[in-house]
Amino acid sequence: GVSIDDNTQGLHRLMAGAQYCQPLNKNFLDAKLMPTLYYQYKKKGYNLHFGAVPYRKLMHTLPEFYLSDSINYAHPNLYGALVQITGKRGFLELYCDWYGLQSRTTREAFQLMVDGEFRAKVFYAGGYISLTHLANKAAPEPRLGVCEKFSVNPLVGINLSPITPLDSFTVQAGYILGYNRERETATQHISHGVHADIYLQWRFLALRNNFFYGNN
């Protein structure tokens, strides 16, 4: 990549690369390279990304009910914009992932996500709010309907890393509410549940355990 760092104007960076994806149960001829190309601007608590931005640029790894490891493997970048605002007590983050550009072969699809965190000593509170939109292919392809999914996930946790010999030790719990709507059939579905997570890391060893109780 190429970067220009100015104490007055901030950091400007243009990054380019590629990620190799080998589909499971396929031969090497079916593998594909997915380009990574984005512009970054960073200054005094603001960090902006535009383009094909790796998910690892997010402040935290997304929970698996938002982005499972299998989806992340095949879809390693978000395509759109990522805005991050950081301060001494926490952060606020917003992104738009436009992963389906409407055409005769592709349905229009995008996801909006807002997440944040507020910290007070070893305690923290935050959460996620997301909206996913799936629409039709371009005309004259037949209509397949328009689907929308909204979810909210408030959570609280404790970071015990500073008072233990571990590099990372966090425990958190939260509630997730999901609402799905299918416009074509005028149907809707509401699901909800509680979850708890524990994460421990010491050097190159890590352990993560997730618990969920609720409905799909």
Predicted regions and their residues:
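Residues that define the transmembrane beta-barrel architecture of outer-membrane proteins
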Residues: 1, 29-35, 75-81, 106-112, ...
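Beta-barrel outer-membrane channel/assembly domains of diderm bacteria
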Residues: 1-41
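A generic structural signal for ordered secondary structure
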Residues: 12-17, 49, 153, 157
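Short glycine-rich beta-strand segments
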Residues: 21, 53-55, 176
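Active-site beta-strand termini and strand-to-loop segments that position acidic
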Residues: 41-43, 85, 200
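Gram-negative (and chloroplast) outer-membrane scaffold detector with strong preference
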Residues: 45-47
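Surface-exposed coil loops of outer-membrane beta-barrel proteins
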Residues: 49-117, 131-133
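Exposed, low-structure sequence patches enriched in small/polar residues
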Residues: 87-91, 99, 105, 113-120, ...
